[in-house]
Amino acid sequence: MEYPNIRSLREDHDFRQCDLASVLHVSQNTYSQYENGVIALTAERLVKLADFYNVSIDYLLGRTDNPEVNRN
């Protein structure tokens, strides 16, 4: 599965892959595989990333260009 925005979010915030790997409690190699679409993120890890960046899961999945979380 592809996650078109997780690499750009990481780079925009000047994080390294190992920084995000630590947040998700995975290896840097595993995180790299997420960014490259080799393996799928679990729902729990998608939520962690969305909360970490304060963006919607739909934004992480590339289903919207709007990163804002709809809290209605």
What are these regions (language model features)?
Residues 25-40:
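Recognition helix of helix-turn-helix/homeodomain-like DNA-binding domains
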Residues 25, 44-59:
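DNA major-groove recognition helix of helix-turn-helix/homeodomain DNA-binding modules
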Residues 35, 53, 61-64:
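DNA major-groove recognition helix of helix-turn-helix
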